[in-house]
Regions:
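Ser/Thr/Gly-rich flexible loops in soluble cytosolic domains mediating phosphotransfer, phosphorylation
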Residues: 327-331
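Flexible phosphate-sensing "switch/lid" loops adjacent to ATP/NTP-binding sites
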Residues: 1-325, 349
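A conserved active-site-flanking secondary-structure segment within enzyme catalytic domains
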Residues: 344-353
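Extended Lys/Arg-rich polyanion-binding regions
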Residues: 340
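Catalytic nucleophile serine of serine hydrolases
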Residues: 337
């Protein structure tokens, strides 16, 4: 079949729907007879996926690989950052941890070419085998203060010769400003690569937005290629905890058993709880206060990606789980997680669940 240009779904911000849209297009290309493969040069995620050979990539690329009919591979996400604190993260390169870095040193131009060469090489390998490569950007494409060290958005699109589709979230408000700003803050040569704008998460009567479509096209000089409705039944696993604050306010169902997952700051692998969310017998929610926790029949203390030390006891005491007496059961959940002693006091002895 005809060799297609790589296509990148970039975003006006985080959580605008890039991962879902990219997964959808992986399946569409597959159904149309092509052999697509997903690619995200750099991912920041607390939830990772283990490939068949035991290496780590972002979960979104694993879902996209499934949509494309492929087995997940580290070339699909060669650089994975796993936050440990607000300023440090574990760097996973080609599926293997290579150490911890603070934000300032990670974005320092010195040594940046090494990482850039690695992600470019991973793309080249995919591009030589698959058609097309369905690329995903990260966060917003208009973080111009990081332009010179950017590995994943427009510089990656320029390297790949990709056609860029800008995904804008209308549900959060400000779609005109975010779309216009994202386009106009690009360099002229980068702006030329943006071939279309996709409005995502629309609610209501589309006829009311038809004038808005024309306004965006006139302002940005880029066609709006579609408007996607707000879907509630697409279960693509989240990579970070941006949606968990909303889940803290809205329970998953009306089941008889109330399950509270403590909303820790650096919670990881919370996708383990997805099946509970979909169980009609369970009312699962993420709790960030002692009052919310006290309403649960079962408390789950999740794992969190953080430096070794004493983060879990202090964090859980702050949330009110250390001495909670109104709950029937408490369950620690994470591979090799240190379990809290029953009285909630610090205890350096590791206890496996």
């Amino acid at each position: 079949m005809k060799k297609l240009h790589p296509i990148m779904f970039a975003g006006t911000g985080s959580d605008v729907g890039k991962s879902v849209v990219a997964a959808g297009f992986c399946r569409i290309f597959k159904q149309d007879g092509y052999c697509p493969a997903p690619f995200k040069a750099q991912n920041m995620a607390l939830n990772s996926y283990a490939t068949p050979d035991g290496l780590e990539i972002g979960r979104a690329q694993a879902v996209q690989a499934e949509a494309a009919g492929l087995s997940p591979h580290t070339d699909m996400n060669p650089l994975l950052l796993k936050p440990q604190t607000d300023k440090t993260c574990q760097v996973v390169l080609n599926g293997r941890p290579i150490g911890n870095r603070d934000a300032y040193s990670y974005f320092n131009p010195k040594g940046r070419d090494v990482l850039r060469n690695e992600v470019n090489a991973a793309f080249d390998r995919l591009n030589s085998r698959y058609n097309p490569v369905v690329m995903e950007g990260a966060g917003s494409i208009s973080e111009i203060n990081l332009r010179e060290t950017d590995l994943v958005n427009m510089p990656m699109a320029m390297y790949a010769g990709a056609d860029v589709i800008l995904v804008a979230d209308i549900d959060r408000g400000g779609v005109f400003a975010s779309a216009y700003g994202s386009v106009m803050l690009q360099r002229p040569e980068e702006r030329k690569r943006i071939k279309g704008i996709l409005i995502n998460k629309f609610r209501g009567d589309i006829r009311l937005f038809e004038p808005g479509v024309k306004m965006i096209e006139e302002l940005c000089g880029v066609p709006v290629i579609g408007v996607l409705p707000y879907f509630k039944d697409i279960f693509v696993e989240e990579e970070d905890n941006l949606q968990l604050a909303s889940k803290a306010r809205h329970a998953s169902g009306n089941g008889k058993v109330s399950v509270a997952v403590v909303l820790l700051r650096h919670i990881s692998n919370f996708t383990d709880f997805n099946m509970l969310e979909r169980d009609s017998r369970v009312n699962l929610y993420y709790a960030d206060s002692a009052e919310d926790i006290s309403k649960a029949n079962i408390i789950i203390i999740p794992g969190q990606q953080e430096h070794p030390g004493r983060p879990q006891p202090s964090a859980t005491r702050r949330h009110g789980t250390g001495h909670n007496q109104g709950c029937r059961k408490r369950k620690d959940r994470c591979g090799h997680l240190r379990r809290l002693p029953d009285d909630g006091h610090d205890d350096k002895r590791p206890r496996r669940h």
